[in-house]
Amino acid sequence: MATEFADTTTHAFVYVAADDPLAQPLLTDLALEYHSRYGSYFGESASTEISRYPVDAFAAPDGAFVVLVRDGIPIAGGAFKRFDERTAELKRIWTAATHRRQGLGRLVVAELEAESARRGYDRVFLTTGPRQPEAKNLYLVTGYTPLFDTALTPDEVVIHAFAKSLDARELDIPGITAAHYSAIRREHADNPRFVALIPESD
């Protein structure tokens, strides 16, 4: 169900539960896109990734799930969950294929950042994969710091992690990077193929 709105010209942001029907087009489309781009690259199905976190991970007070609608139709969206006490992790950022190249991804990221700040977080963190260059470019142009060597090829980096401060404090890049690798190994402990893709250290 919708809990709050934030109007932006002809669009509206609707905050919902991750299992709300309004969120399902986003999750279904993401699963299809992950499958088409990665197949068995990570040693697990796209549906496994989409269902990795419980619904309440994206619920208040620690998280949120937002859908950008136009005339009641979901056209973009995203979510965040708690990474640590200071950091929100952005997830599930999506724009419908029929509405891309309209700047909607930037709107979603900005809304997630604003809501993260309202929830008390002072920095945000996110990851994307080697076969999503559009996502990488989106985060670079919206002020995110890459936590990887940008001189490497996408397949050498594998998991592209980014962070951004929401206030004037300087980012603790080594600390966030170490926490990122630790979280990946923990969350994918049952998938040795995935863990093998992750560097031992930064």
Residue map of PLM features:
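Conserved acetyl-CoA-binding loop-helix of GNAT-fold acetyltransferases
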Residues: 95, 101-114, 140-141
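A short, well-structured alpha-helix characteristic of acyl/acetyltransferase catalytic modules
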Residues: 1-44, 168-202
